[in-house]
Structures are given as C-alpha cells and as structure tokens.
Amino acid sequence: MLAFFDPEQFKHEPKFSLFSGVPKPNSEVSERAKVLRDALLQHGHELKIPKPHGIIPVEAVHHQDYLHFLKNIYRRWQEIPGASAEVIPNIHPNRTAGNIPESAVGQAGWYMADTACPISNETWNSALASANTAVGAAQAVLDGHNSAYALCRPPGHHAFADLAGGFCFLNNSAIAAQHLRLNFQKVVILDVDVHHGNGTQSIFYQRDDVLTVSLHADPVSFYPFFWGYSHE
C-alpha cells in the first residue's frame, strides 16, 4: 500500500493537558506516529514524504482568521510577561453572543475549545505538515491509485473550521475530502474512533456532497460530550 508521512510532524510535542481538573502529561506524543511509521515499514509498505501542496487546500476548509491565529499565537503568547511555555486557554466564551478579542489570552479562549491542545513554537508547522500529508494521499487517489494511507499527527477530526480541540488543529480528513471533491462529486468520510468526529461533522453538516459517518462511544459520558448523538 502506498503511504505518506512527513517527519516534520514529530516536532509537535505538547506537554500539558487537563483531565478532570488534574494537570497531566499530554498523551498526543510523537511516539504514536513512530509506532505506526515503523509498522508500515516493517510490513513492506511504500512510505513517501508528500510533496508540498501549499496552503490553498487548508484554506478551502478553515477560516482565514483561525489560520492566522494558529500561525502567530505562540509568538504573541511569549510576549506576555510570565506566560506559560505553551499556549493554554484559561477562558472559554459562549460564542453565540460574543466578539473575537484582540488580546492573545482572549483569542486563545476563542479559538481553542479545551486544554488538550496546547500550542508550542512547532505546532503550526507540524499541523500544516499533517494536513499536507492528508492532501498527498488524496492526490494519489486523484492520480489513479486505488488507495493511499496518510499517517497524520497532530490528528484532526475534533478541529472545526475555526476552532482547535481534542489534540486537533487542522482537520486532516476534511481537508483531504475537500481536495477529492476536485474530481469526485460525492465523498464519504468514515470516522472510526472512540471519540465522535465533531469537527468533521460540523464542517460538512450543511452540505450534501460530503457524507460524514462516525462510529464512537456514547457522548452522554464521553468526550466530546456535546456532539455525536443519534438525532444528529
């Protein structure tokens, strides 16, 4: 099987997360990708570094203001006296009746849904490499391959068009699906994960050209809690 992976993804190494009010080491570590990469090589799959596809496929899914935030927030955060080493929000507004603030602290709350996705100086480049890997696999299918595998981290299915969350910054599967729409009238995303793919669902919820199907644990008592119910 043809597979794609960009070593740039290893550079994102989040340290902090908060579970049930308790600070814990972040579990979305580069070792997860190393295990999968090594398994691909050990089983004889062809592993390629994707060629650059630029920012256009990402911009086709994510809002410009959100991308500007992801690209610049770490630098702005470090200018705050006494700020933490990683960008971690301490306020989460109700977006239905609010305005995008100018301050770095306020924007962290606006664009980050939880504390599981801290941003470091390498996060933007790694997230972009992850998304580019997904586009590379999608392009391989457009070029005639029957299948292609994209090894992507940071992951993506909790990322909304303008909101990070659940370890996710750029929605890799949504970006790949949108890229496939260049040649295909209909695309299906099958999301098999213990967590509901709330970001992916949100991006395509009002569209009939991309079907999202998520198999996940009951959100009544499991992340992401607010999405993933049967009536949706």
Label each region the model flagged:
Residues 1-190, 195-232:
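HDAC/HDAC-like amidohydrolase catalytic core signature
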